[in-house]
């Protein structure tokens, strides 16, 4: 069955845009909703559109479910300017988790209603080493009705992320560790699509490569 979550990343010379979307329902319908949402938002934002235009476009574009009569996908946007400015926007999904020097941070957020949707936005300046971890609700549903009656709540996810942090841990390792725990809580049989995406703020590094003639004239 197709995954109902989708992550899209666009890299530009001066910024990186990450969008995680979770389509309503499951299978093909959810996949279509999540794919359209992530693609539309990332493409528009890479062209300097604001969140208002993105949400309005999604509302006019997403196919309406014939059963529920609505078109719906949650999303989390993380926009990283290469000067350190961060913009995030969240709609109806689990809130992202942020680490700074291994300590949990909660950036100040403001809510705006755009096209009938409550969008939570934040603006802040990142520091080297900051990590922003976003995830679909499959993470906080992990273990529900199995190892954990009420699922793995966000506070539990935050505690795990902080315990798992160590200096120089990569975004790839952090996301892999988080997904592995979810798989364990689901006992290898996920009850919901589970997706984790992380952004790790790192200073730009320069690599120099020296190339010379072969040691043997025959080469």
Regions found by a protein language model. Name each.
Residues 1-13, 106-145:
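Acidic loop->beta-strand submotif enriched in PP2C/PPM serine/threonine phosphatases
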Residues 22-23, 93, 131-139, 193:
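DG-centered beta-turn motif at the end of beta-strands
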Residues 200-219:
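Regulatory/sensor and coupling segments of signal-transduction and defense proteins
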Residues 26-47, 132-182:
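Active-site-proximal, acidic helix/loop segment immediately C-terminal to a metal-coordinating Asp/Glu
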Residues 8-19, 26-32:
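N-terminal glycine-rich anion-binding loops that anchor highly charged ligand groups
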Residues 13-17, 128-131, 192, 206:
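Short hydrophobic/glycine-rich mini-motifs in sensory/regulatory modules
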Residues 75, 84, 95-126, 132, ...:
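Small-residue (GG/TT-enriched) beta-loop-alpha framework at ligand/catalytic clefts
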């Amino acid at each position: 069955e197709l995954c109902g979550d989708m992550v899209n990343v666009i890299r530009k010379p001066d910024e990186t845009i990450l969008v995680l979307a979770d389509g309503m329902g499951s299978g093909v319908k959810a996949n279509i909703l999540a794919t359209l949402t992530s693609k539309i938002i990332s493409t528009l934002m890479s062209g300097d559109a604001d969140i208002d235009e993105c949400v309005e476009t999604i509302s006019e574009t997403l196919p309406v479910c014939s059963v529920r009569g609505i078109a719906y996908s949650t999303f989390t946007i993380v926009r990283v300017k290469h000067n350190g400015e961060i913009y995030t926007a969240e709609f109806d999904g689990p809130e992202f988790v942020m680490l700074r020097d291994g300590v949990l941070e909660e950036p100040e957020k403001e809510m705006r209603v755009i096209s009938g949707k409550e969008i939570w936005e934040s603006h802040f300046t990142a520091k080297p080493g900051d990590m922003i971890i976003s995830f679909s609700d499959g993470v906080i549903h992990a273990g529900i009705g199995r190892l954990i009656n009420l699922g793995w709540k966000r506070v539990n996810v935050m505690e795990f992320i902080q315990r798992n942090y160590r200096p120089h841990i990569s975004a790839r390792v952090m996301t892999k560790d988080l997904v592995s725990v979810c798989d364990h809580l689901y006992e290898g049989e996920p009850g919901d699509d589970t997706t984790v995406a992380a952004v790790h703020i790192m200073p730009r590094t320069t690599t120099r490569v020296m190339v010379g003639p072969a040691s043997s004239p025959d080469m």
